[in-house]
């Protein structure tokens, strides 16, 4: 049962990009809907828990949530530029590299020689995996430009995601205490990011995108439980498996085309990212 709970984040976060893409809408509508869903879920959690708030917890968690919106909105943009099956392994790999480097240099993780060797070997595998998943066999001017835009967009996205993780870690804030102020920060940032949009912010797609927002929040809550049930290393490693669902789902359910060579390299790349993520989880233990 513990492993089932620990797999919920991977399932929720793996399916979420597929649901967002099926619902549709512009990235600004998607981020507003997703953050509204996360806020609704956070309010429900708040009612049944007893979080402890200080000014530091509220402000830092709010800023952390704003960084998440930066990361998530740019991930949505990348879906339109390079597709879900390329975006998710690239995004996961970049996040693993970013958070791991912060962990080593800011929080002095991997404190032994063996853990340093294991951790940096994992980063090498992840970087190789990133290159493999971004491979394009038949490049034309349009697809090449989209890939360049997608990589830049995902670099910005990764800054957001890494900031989201690092800020609460820096101030040693419990995930339970952070949930509501983080969600408020997500909503405020999502609304601010959409101010200059020419499209309507509130459409049918906006409200439907509350569903993936609840899915993301469910995965986040399950991760808090799984860290206690199976340990941070195992919980973290299992949560990375969602990239398999989203990558394969992008190809099978969203109809994203791959040549045989691209498909083989994507599969190898995803496997390397998962192995690297698992090794990082072990190095964290």
Swiss-Prot record:
Specify the protein's topology with respect to the membrane: Multi-pass membrane protein
Q: Which InterPro entries match?
A: Sugar_transport
Q: Which UniProt keywords apply?
A: Cell membrane, Membrane, Sugar transport, Transmembrane, Transmembrane helix, Transport
Q: Which residues cross the membrane?
A: 5-24, 31-48, 53-71, 84-106, 116-135, 151-173, 178-195, 207-226, 232-254, 263-282
Q: Which Gene Ontology cellular-component terms appear in the entry?
A: plasma membrane
Q: Does the keyword Cell membrane apply?
A: yes
Alphabetized Pfam families for the sequence? Sugar_transport (PF06800)
Where in or outside the cell it occurs: the entry states: Cell membrane
Q: What GO molecular-function term can you cite, just one?
A: carbohydrate transmembrane transporter activity
Q: Give the UniProt family note.
A: Belongs to the GRP transporter (TC 2.A.7.5) family.
The protein in question is named: Putative sugar uptake protein lin0212
